């Protein structure tokens, strides 16, 4: 158990990145498949299982969906992801390269460059965050 976990009131049985199945989006808006690389012994659970189990215990039951079903739901409610699915990400057409959103239909090639020449709404906005001091600092009881 890690030093942080020793201080926790609740420990969730999450998996490491190498144990996960699903998708991720990087900073260039590229959605790519993630495939489980290792099988770890123990009682770990997918993040989606943890979320739905917490909801169930709070009185809001939800079905346990597969990563592909979750991606399909995201595509059905988010127009810029409408053309992205596990099936398409796994296809020879995509060839392991992923798709860049917006990808608005099943035959859309994705959008490698989002803004050409200028931003759609004019200049970009820069808003530096104001410094906020920590509400709690490490102490003897919680040294991390």
Predicted regions and their residues:
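Long, low-complexity segments enriched in small/aliphatic residues
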Residues: 67-144
């Amino acid at each position: 158990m890690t030093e942080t976990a020793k201080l926790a009131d609740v420990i969730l049985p999450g998996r490491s990145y190498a144990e996960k199945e699903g998708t991720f989006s990087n900073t260039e808006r590229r959605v790519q498949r993630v495939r489980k690389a290792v099988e770890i012994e123990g009682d770990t659970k997918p993040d989606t299982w943890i979320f739905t189990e917490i909801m169930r215990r709070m009185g809001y039951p939800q079905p346990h969906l597969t990563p592909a079903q979750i991606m399909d739901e995201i595509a059905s409610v988010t127009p810029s992801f409408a053309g992205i699915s596990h099936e398409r990400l796994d296809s020879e057409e995509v060839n392991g390269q992923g798709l860049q959103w917006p990808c608005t239909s099943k035959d859309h090639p994705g959008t490698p460059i989002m803004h050409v020449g200028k931003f759609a709404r004019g200049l970009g906005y820069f808003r530096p965050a104001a410094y906020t001091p920590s509400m709690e600092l490490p102490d003897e009881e919680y040294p991390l």
